Every structure is written in C-alpha cells, then in structure tokens.
C-alpha cells in the first residue's frame, strides 16, 4: 500500500473537508457528527484508491477524480452504517469500535447513512470537469448502489437468512 500513500493522504484530506465542523446549523450538528464518526473511522480506503489509481492509469488527473473517489467511499460507508443496524446484521463493532447506531442510536444512524448517500452525489456532481462526465459518473454510482446493485444484494442477503447458500447465490448477493 506504500505506493498508494499519496492517494490515501489526498483522500483523507478530502473526506475531512466534505463534512466540516462545526455544522452550519446547531440543530443538524448531531447528524453531521454521526456521519463523520463513521466516514472518518479509518479503513483501508481501497475503493477510493482504486478510483484514483485507475484514473491515473488511464492518463487522467487523479486530483480531478477526487470527488468521485470520495463519493464512492461515502456510499460504502453509508452501506456499512445501514448494514450494522439491528434490522439488518445487528453488528456492535465496526473498524474496531462501536457501530454508529450503538453510539448515536438507530434513528440517527439511519439519518447518517442517508446523509452520506446524498452527500456522495453532491460531492460527485461537484466535479470540475465536463458536466456530462459528472452526470455519467453519478449515474454509474447510482446504478451500482441501487436496487440492481448493492441494495439488491442486501435484499438477497436478507432473504437468504437461515437458508443454505450456494456459490451462485453468493455471487448474486455480491453483484446485486
């Protein structure tokens, strides 16, 4: 991962700036804090690193792809927050510390996930390049995260609880 260190530094700085503190409105401070708790909890950041690395590999400027890299990480984090909820996998720990709903409560965790999902699209659409590229990227992200992608995979996961799961079903869950 050492060769990806410059990417990781850029990603962490960009993620930190996406959700500045203090919140603009004191009434929304709890949801911003909850969003930051999970988004800035560390992790390998494989997904956003891949976005920047592929951009560079294709001859692009990784700095320009940073909004998309951050958006991908925000969608991933939102999915983890929701996946940890009692109505899903009911996990108590994530990345070595209490899950979002254990710290902030279920309602705030749900809002934090929703907030990260919408912030992801706001961030992706802040891309400074050609507007059609931003729209194309946002559409791809929506398709991958939606009912035919990640959400669909979670649905299959819930439906298969307590059942024998074969390799084909695991592939369906993974691919949505």
Language model features with spans:
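N-terminal amphipathic/basic leader segments beginning at the initiator methionine
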Residues: 1-23
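Mg2+-dependent prenyl diphosphate-binding active-site environment of isoprenoid biosynthetic enzymes
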Residues: 6-9, 26-176
């Amino acid at each position: 991962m050492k060769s990806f260190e410059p990417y990781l530094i850029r990603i962490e700085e960009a993620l930190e700036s996406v959700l500045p503190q203090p919140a603009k409105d004191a009434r929304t401070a709890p949801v911003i804090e909850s969003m930051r708790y999970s988004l800035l909890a560390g992790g390998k950041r494989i997904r956003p690193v891949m976005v920047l690395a592929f951009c560079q590999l294709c001859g692009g400027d990784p700095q320009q792809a940073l909004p998309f890299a951050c958006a991908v990480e925000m969608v991933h984090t939102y999915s983890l927050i929701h996946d940890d909820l009692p109505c899903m996998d009911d996990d108590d720990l994530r990345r070595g510390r209490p899950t979002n709903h254990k710290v902030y409560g279920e309602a705030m965790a749900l809002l934090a996930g929703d907030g990260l999902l919408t912030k992801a699209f706001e961030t992706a659409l802040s891309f400074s390049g050609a507007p059609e590229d931003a729209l194309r990227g946002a559409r791809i992200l929506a398709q991958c995260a939606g009912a035919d992608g990640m959400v669909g995979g979670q649905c299959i996961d819930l439906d298969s609880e307590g059942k024998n799961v074969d390799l084909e079903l695991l592939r369906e869950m993974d691919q949505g």
